Structure formats: C-alpha cells, structure tokens
Amino acid sequence: IGLNGQKVVSKRYSLKDANGNAIEQWEDIVRRVVGHVSTAERDSQARDRFYGAMTGVMLNREFVPNTPCLVNAGKPNGQLAACFVLKVPDSIEGIMHHAQSAAIIHQ
C-alpha cells in the first residue's frame, strides 16, 4: 500500500486511541476485519481456511469490503452493512412497525 493509501487508511479506517491517533496499519485492519467476519463459520477448519484465504485476498487488495465493514468490524454492535431493505406496508401500523425495525437495526 502506498503512502497516500496509508494516509487514507489511518484517517478513515483505523481504530483510534483516546487522543484520536490511528493505532492500526492496513495489515492490522485486515486481521481485525477478517477475524471478525470469519466467526460466522462455526466449523473451526472452515473458519481457518476462510481466514487464510480472505486475509490474502484483502492484503493483495483483490477485494476490499465496504466502509462500514472496515470501520466497525470487531467493535461491539459494529454494523457491517451499508444499507438495509425493509418492506413498508401501506398502513399506520405497518409504518410504525417499520420505524421500530429501523430503530432496532441502527441502535
């Protein structure tokens, strides 16, 4: 990753210390993100295979997930998706249920 890339990573995606200083390099972010996402695999061998493969893919920048994933993976209640699609029924009850669902998603 080049100098400009390092600056972008530090400013936008790295975890910060109490003073707002970046505490991660690109390699650290990759390990944090892949470590978090790989927990979806229940089987430890599958998890290890995914971790190894995905780490290589991300380090080579063949695939880089979206910003919410880079920023929030590994944090408590970290939201990894950028958007959600919910059906909104055409009634007051349905609209209010939708508002409640949206609030729960974003809490």
Label each PLM-derived region with a short phrase.
Residues I1-Q107:
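Extended catalytic cores of very large enzyme megasubunits
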